[in-house]
Amino acid sequence: MKTTLAALALAIATAAHAASPMAVRVLDWMLPVPANWTPQVPSSDMRVAQFTIKSEGGSADAAVFYFGQGSGGSVEENTQRWASQFLDDAGKPAKPRIEKGTTGGMPVTWVSLDGRYARGMGTGPQGEAKAKQSLRVAVIETDRGNLFFQLWGDEAAIARQFPLMKMVVSQMKRGA
């Protein structure tokens, strides 16, 4: 019973956040970003959008990366690089979970990783790895090149925010 009530409360909270999104332009697309995602000035030229996220269960961040048409590496190369930054509970490289889908007629590859994470730009851990971290990535194959939409942070926060990320990606629209 408690589990059912907790799941219901989480669903209601998620729906409440999703009910009042703000529109954010990313290149040619409008994204319906949840109200608890605070836009930030992108910290690098590779980021076309960046957010800090208030969430129960810890901290989270999101960013959309764009490297230009034909740049940024393949989905497979990036998945290998992201996986190299994670270790599982046994200290071995974490195995990514991969799902394929579409949004607005564009292919999307979803990559999920959990474990000890040392976020960085290169291959392998960069700095001190933090335990109980998650990374969710949607690689959206647009006609202008790939958009890399990343959500990362504490496992509990990402568990709450990932349904909202999926909503943002599924409802992105060209133009407007």
Model-predicted regions and their roles:
Residues 27-89, 99:
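Secretory pathway targeting signatures of secreted, lumenal, and periplasmic proteins
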Residues 40, 56, 124-132, 175:
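Charge-biased low-complexity segments
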Residues 46, 79-140:
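Signature of long, low-cysteine stretches enriched in small and polar/charged residues
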Residues 16-21:
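Boundary at the C-terminal end of the N-terminal hydrophobic targeting segment
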Residues 73-75, 121-122, 159-163:
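A short, polar/proline- and glycine-enriched secondary-structure boundary/capping micro-motif
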Residues 6-13:
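Bacterial N-terminal signal peptides
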Residues 56, 67-69, 114-118, 144, ...:
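Solvent-exposed coil/turn segments that connect beta secondary-structure elements
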Residues 37, 143-176:
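Surface-exposed amphipathic alpha-helical segments
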